[in-house]
Amino acid sequence: MADKPVVMHIITRLEAGGSSRNTIDSCGAQTPDYGVVLAAGPHPDAVAMAKLLPPEVNYIEVPHLQRELSPIKDLRALLELRRQIQLLQPDIVHTHTSKAGALGRLAAALAGGRKPVVVHTPHGHILYGYYGPVKTWIFLLAERILARFTDYFIALTPGEMRESVEVGLGRAPQWRVVHSGVDLKPPAVPAHKRDLGIAEGEIAVGTVARLEPVKGVEYFLRAAALLRANRPGLKFKFVIIGGGALEGPLRRLAGQLFLDQTVIFTGHRADAAALLPALDIYVQPSLNEGMGRAPLEAQALGLPAVVSRVCGLPDVIREGQTGYSVPPADAGALAISIEKLALDAGLRARMGAAAKAWALATDEAGRPRWGAESMNARLLALYKEILG
């Protein structure tokens, strides 16, 4: 690494999720120009995920780095990270996600010696939708303090950047937008309606989500109940692709809303994207979403998308052309937009065609606009800018 500038990435854990996969992709793309180090805490997926790294990347497991709050382990992780920064003397420390962002930035500040340039990618904010007001205020205060130890921030979308700057997380000149890279190739074996138990005459409306409160699936179910009551002549199937802690409560809610025969719960599916071709309309009812990969995957397959008007979701559709955005936690507004698409097959087709063109468009260099290659090129351009 002696003949190249060194970039040290720090992420809380390597798991089978978007932020981890994008960080791994970025590490691989940076090896021709940089010595690359990736430090992460332990996780059951870490061994498999680390195998995706090219051999040129120096992978370091930080034993005490974990997502959960633990003062003793957090202090140990901070000291471990400080020691690695002192040993490696990186030119750039690039932190990812909240916990690694906090400890990594503090470690860089405390390491002494030559100060690295500190870049932080939150991979979405936690300003609303996750916690109550007191806990959110504490997180916000902590992030404002940490902003003093941050040279540059990276947002996934203009919406994330705007909302972060509005609450005092850094200054606008410190922020750049670099979207997550999304693989929008069509699935090798696309699902058909019959594969999910959907009759040909039924309008399939679906969502892909971890079943936890911030994903807003409760409002998807309540919108489904409104549609069934208000439009008894339309035949719907509502598909929830994903598993999680709320699967049981959501199944019970579906029963209470008399949706037992109308809603399909697939549970966790590793091939979630392959199920999207069975749908007619895609819905993302999240209470907060940094960017939203699934709406892009759905649009790339020609589906119009209805999304919540939160953080980065409005940035991944074209309002009124490829889909609609609605206020969060508003089942009525969600139902109205779904109904508009359900009643008009021609509108669905036109929006679906526009959605496919939008999702699969190229950037100024001819790369897929939402792909990993475009993401990595923008990140490398930022590194070149900040190192002069």
Indicate residue ranges for each PLM-predicted region:
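Aromatic "clamp/platform" in nucleotide-sugar-dependent glycosyltransferases that forms part
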Residues: H268, L287
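A short, active-site helix/loop in glycosyltransferases that binds the activated sugar's phosphate group
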Residues: R148-R176, V182-L184
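N-terminal strand-loop element at the rim of the active site
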Residues: H9-K73, E163, G168, W175-V177, ...
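Short hydrophobic beta-strand element within catalytic cores of glycosyltransferases
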Residues: P304-V307, I317
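Conserved acidic donor-binding segment of nucleotide-sugar-dependent glycosyltransferases
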Residues: E319-G320, Y324-A331, K340-G346
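A short helix/loop element that forms part of the nucleotide-sugar donor recognition site in Leloir-type
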Residues: A50, E80, P186-A199, A204
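A conserved mid-protein helix/loop that constitutes part of the nucleotide-sugar donor-binding site
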Residues: S20-D25, I203, T207-A229, A245-R252, ...
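Nucleotide-activated donor-binding/catalytic signature segment of Leloir-type glycosyltransferases, i.e.
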Residues: R251-G267
